Amino acid sequence: MCKMEKFLYHRKLWEMNVKLLGESKVEKLKNSFVSRPRMSLWMIRAVTVLLLWSCFVHLMALGEMWGPRLFKGWPSCFNHHQLSTAAEMTSLPTKIALPPKRVYVNNGYLMVSCNGGLNQMRAAICDMVTVARYMNVTLIVPELDKTSFWNDPSEFKDIFDVDHFISSLRDEVRILKELPPRLKKRVELGVYHEMPPISWSNMSYYQNQILPLVKKHKVLHLNRTDTRLANNGLPVEVQKLRCRVNFNGLKFTPQIEELGRRVVKILREKGPFLVLHLRYEMDMLAFSGCSHGCNPEEEEELTRMRYAYPWWKEKVINSELKRKDGLCPLTPEETALTLTALGIDRNVQIYIAAGEIYGGQRRMKALTDAFPNVVRKETLLESSDLDFCRNHSSQMAALDYLVALESDIFVPTNDGNMARVVEGHRRFLGFKKTIQLNRRFLVKLIDEYTEGLLSWDVFSSTVKAFHSTRMGSPKRRLVIPNRPKEEDYFYANPQECLQLLDEPLRVI
């Protein structure tokens, strides 16, 4: 029985009990007190208990409806009228009890500047909160990257609910929006220490190398934060705190969350939907050197862009070699073939979680021909709905993140930060289906099919068989000692925070 049916059932039960008590027992009690003033006390108690129990049942039903939701999907037995009614009820504000503050001797202040796109910064924030907690320092709300390719001026408070971030983690670490005035003045005068921590470090590095610097300088600024904490070899409580920050401490702003709910509601009204993280934007192709399917003019444009950014060290890139090694995102044409081979219903809604696709409609034609119900946030919402986050790529990515979490199927066409962080979050939400495409395997198979070396039936059955174990089901991370870039990423499979089979880590 779904929650709405329980609610209606308990409500009828409550009304029936109230009616019986109001019209029958109350009247009898009244007469009884007149005619028999020495009525047995147990009868009064019995009636009182019955009345209280009826009220309790009713309140329990309401409690199920009004309990906090973490952007959950609606029960399948809701109709549209019940859906809108329940949505109104769950929008009522609830008072949340804050955890008690953790009391500790403060060793200093940690400032961090995150680098990269939204999800690279998201993982870095989780790491830096964890590091701050185990060094017993005060963390200043992280600064987000404003100088990278995306040139997004968004502050932390423009993307994340900063008050929730501070209060929800206060039983672990003290977080401030800014330094105390005296120390802030010192920083403005340049009297502080700044450095990038070493990548893939364990907790002993932070205890033995970083903490002494915090104590010495009082304020330490870590100016790079990507992958600065190891995937493996950390205490379980450290890993669980990383999860807690990711899944509970980091909430998007109410404005972004509300827009995400609206997009999901629009999609759900038309049935199931698949979110496709089609990472085929200009920056990805330029910096990766992947130009398969592009015309000569486009290849030249991508090369010019790569050379225009001096911080990008790799300039000369063999596109076809990278593609065959599985290091390029799938093209829209390759994606259409792959989804069809996997047996995805051509009528399913496909939500594109990405920026502007390079090559526009010309490159998207194969995908939209194969799957006519391709949509984007720009086509589902009014233009004015997106005004607040227009030209703010991280806020747009936050909206896509929310929709990706709620999708029936999530399919990324590369293994970048969004693909991996969303995959891990979907595992946490109950191992929701995420198809992890093996690009190296697929491009070889696609080339054989397009060259006429494979029939469609063989191509399709091979793709299905290979990916049958790559659907986001429970598994252990692959550990490769001293090669952290090649092993499974912690945030893609935070197994310490999940219900898994009792299996050891896979080590090669």
From Swiss-Prot:
Q: In which pathway does it act?
A: Glycan metabolism; pectin biosynthesis
Q: What happens when the gene is disrupted?
A: Reduced volume of the seed coat mucilage due to reduced levels of rhamnogalacturonan I (RG-I) in the seed coat mucilage.
pH curve summary? Optimum pH is 7.0.
User: What positions does the record give for glycosylation?
Assistant: 136, 202, 223, 391
Alphabetized GO MF terms: UDP-glycosyltransferase activity
Q: What is the lineage of its organism?
A: Eukaryota, Viridiplantae, Streptophyta, Embryophyta, Tracheophyta
Q: Where in the cell is it found?
A: Golgi apparatus membrane
Which chain regions cross the lipid bilayer?
Answer: 41-63
Q: What is this protein called?
A: Rhamnogalacturonan I rhamnosyltransferase 1
